């Protein structure tokens, strides 16, 4: 049944959740050498997300159709990405039509942030995650949506001059101050290295794109708040990433996650490109050469048609037998 649902979602990708997720992510266009109290356009360009035109609620908030048992759902991460795309369009054009849409997405995220243990602001998912990622219950939170909501709400706050948004941002940031065992999204390995988990379970997954998007949210919060703990979290995560980045290199493609004792899952063509754009942004922010090194290497993989074909074949086999 799982394979059947995946086939249906792919076959109907123009009307499924893939209609949103597979909209191209491009290299960011902002200025990333910023000082305190400054934010520019987001670190990757989500403006293509604004082209999503399939399902919206009556207020204009995007809905995703996962087909099968999950059906049509709100996804906090998708809403934050759509909002960041709207912000990119506003930065580029200054057209007023984007302001109302930015407001709608921001208000949804604020209205749907619930307060949990330790005062943590939670953007909860109302549907189950994939069994592969060990998320079998509704009501879970994810570092990627928590982080991207922070990034979007801070930009919306500045664009709309809605300084009250900072209250929700501060609650969301608390999820990065607590471990998964205390209601947060942070996990640690045996060496004490920090991970911001897209799928917060006991076993460390270190999904690469989710980890980095979460780091961007922490970094944005640091820029606006000057919070020393946010700076430390970002630096600790950079140390983790620099140490483990070589493990994401399959020799012909990038790896999606670092689950141990599992067959290595290659990133899809879409997410391989996301990894490249994220690493370019991290290099622009930090000037750490390792990020540029892997961005260049993985871009060469991307431009090699044989490597691309091998990655596609490997991914299809993985999805059928292991996902």
Q: Which residue stretches match the model-derived regions?
A:
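Glycan-recognition and catalytic cores of secretory/periplasmic carbohydrate-active enzymes
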Residues: 1-323
């Amino acid at each position: 049944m799982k394979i059947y649902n995946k086939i249906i979602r792919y076959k109907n990708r123009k009307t499924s959740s893939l209609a949103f997720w597979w909209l191209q992510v491009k290299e960011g266009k902002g200025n990333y050498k910023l000082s305190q109290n400054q934010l520019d356009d987001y670190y990757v360009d989500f403006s293509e997300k604004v082209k999503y035109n399939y399902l919206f609620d009556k207020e204009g908030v995007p809905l995703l159709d996962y087909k099968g048992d999950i059906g049509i759902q709100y996804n906090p991460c998708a809403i934050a990405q759509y909002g960041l795309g709207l912000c990119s369009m506003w930065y580029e054009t200054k057209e007023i039509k984007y302001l109302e849409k930015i407001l709608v997405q921001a208000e949804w995220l604020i209205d749907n942030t619930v307060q949990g243990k330790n005062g943590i602001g939670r953007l909860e998912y109302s549907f189950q995650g994939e069994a592969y990622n060990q998320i079998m219950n509704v009501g879970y939170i994810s570092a990627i949506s928590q982080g991207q909501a922070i990034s979007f709400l801070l930009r919306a706050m500045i664009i709309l001059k809605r300084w009250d948004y900072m209250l929700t941002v501060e609650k969301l940031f608390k999820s990065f101050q607590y471990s998964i065992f205390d209601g947060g999204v942070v996990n640690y390995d045996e060496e004490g290295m920090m991970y911001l988990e897209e799928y917060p379970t006991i076993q460390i997954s270190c999904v690469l794109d989710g980890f980095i998007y979460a780091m961007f949210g922490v970094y944005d919060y640091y820029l606006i708040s000057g919070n020393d703990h946010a700076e430390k979290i970002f630096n600790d995560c950079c140390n983790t990433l620099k140490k483990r980045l070589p493990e994401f290199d399959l020799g012909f493609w990038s790896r999606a996650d670092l689950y141990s004792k599992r067959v290595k899952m290659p990133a899809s063509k879409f997410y391989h490109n996301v990894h490249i754009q994220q690493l370019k942004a991290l290099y622009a922010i930090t000037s750490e050469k390792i990020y540029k090194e892997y961005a260049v290497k993985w871009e060469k993989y991307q431009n090699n048609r044989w490597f691309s074909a091998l990655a596609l074949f490997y991914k299809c086999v993985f999805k059928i037998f292991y996902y």
